[in-house]
């Protein structure tokens, strides 16, 4: 998969060093994945949530942080829509946020 907005991940882990290794691991796994449908993601990430419009919520570092992406399965692309602490996630609408 092609991941759009890698800089968002880097900026976040500079502010939250505890998230660096989990985000790098997610990036490496997602980059080499070939997800064709939501079930492909769910097989690898059991705790993932789907919130409509091809949006996927990943728990990062044991649920301390949340990553919301939009997946364009047909184009094998992932667009980062939100990355924040769990507290920040609680204040947004995961289905519509565009704050990457």
Predicted regions mapped to residue ranges:
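Basic, Lys/Arg-enriched alpha-helical interface segments
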Residues: 1-64, 73-79, 86-100
């Amino acid at each position: 998969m092609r991941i759009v907005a890698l800089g968002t991940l880097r900026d976040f882990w500079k502010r939250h060093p505890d998230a660096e290794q989990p985000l790098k691991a997610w990036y490496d796994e997602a980059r080499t994945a070939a997800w064709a449908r939501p079930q492909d993601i769910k097989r690898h990430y059991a705790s993932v949530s789907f919130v409509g419009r091809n949006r996927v919520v990943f728990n990062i570092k044991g649920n301390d942080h949340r990553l919301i992406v939009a997946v364009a399965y047909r184009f094998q692309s992932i667009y980062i829509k939100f990355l924040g602490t769990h507290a920040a996630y609680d204040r947004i609408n995961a289905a519509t946020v565009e704050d990457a």
